[in-house]
Amino acid sequence: MIINAKGPASFAEKYIVRSIWENKFPPGSILPAERELSELIGVTRTTLREVLQRLARDGWLKIQHGKPTRVNNFWETSGLNILETIADLNPEGFPVLVDQLLSARTNVSAIYFRGALRYNPETAVDVLAKIHQLENTAESFAEYDYLLHHTLAFSSGNPLYVLILNGFKGLYSRVGRYYFSSAEARLLALNFYKELEVLAKAKNYTDVPALMRTYGINSGKMWLQLRDDMPASIAQDN
């Protein structure tokens, strides 16, 4: 097992998580005793204990006082915070993970975009006004796109959407910089922003779902043209 890590704790965490992912520690199984596991990995028991607590908080493990540590089915117990880890564990499946991520974000964003234009159209107008000073670079578009989503999610009347977006942030930022490296993708997005601005100024929230659906289809087609050339390094949170 080849693991790149920045220190003992990082190595131990990646070792255990990869072992769970590769079914060496399958769901429902009991982890080796602390002393045995620390010797196996090559870290101190104190370091291992800290790592186990962190993995339990992320849903990988179940720790109960006086009982052995049990491996969870992370698909049932973890949250969006493990997206980065899954991308790192499964680079071959990363394009599919991104497809699923973008599909989920498109579906959810249609709800909070509509909510923002309904309940806080002035906020939507303010953030959309920034498109007129937007630099035509991948970095600027990726940053603005996240700002737009974050602002409208917070203004939608349900701030829980912001927490969902926060779970996507690191991964989406890297994918976004790659996606917006395409001039066609930037133009497509800019036209979408302009149409959304027109709706926001008119306080027309009823037409938002149709606009989002059209943009979702068109940006999805654009993504399919770009995904096969996506660098594998994007999966890594360096």
From Swiss-Prot:
Sorted alphabetically, the keyword list is: Activator, Cytoplasm, DNA-binding, Fatty acid metabolism, Lipid metabolism, Repressor, Transcription, Transcription regulation
Principal location listed in the UniProt entry: cytoplasm
Q: Which residues bind DNA?
A: 34-53
Q: Which residues form the HTH gntR-type domain?
A: 6-74
Say which domain of life the source belongs to: Bacteria
Lipid metabolism as a keyword of this entry, yes or no, is yes
- What are the subcellular locations of this protein? Cytoplasm
In Gene Ontology terms, what is one molecular function of this protein?
Answer: fatty-acyl-CoA binding
What biological process terms from GO does the record include?
A: fatty acid metabolic process; regulation of fatty acid metabolic process
Q: Which InterPro entries match?
A: FA-response_TF_FadR, FadR_C, TF_FadR/GntR_C, Tscrpt_reg_HTH_GntR, WH-like_DNA-bd_sf, WH_DNA-bd_sf
Which GO CC annotations does the UniProt entry carry?
cytoplasm
The UniProt entry, under SMART domains, shows: HTH_GNTR
- Subunit: Homodimer.
Function, as annotated: Multifunctional regulator of fatty acid metabolism.
HAMAP family to which the protein is assigned, alphabetical:
HTH_FadR
| Protein name per UniProt | Fatty acid metabolism regulator protein
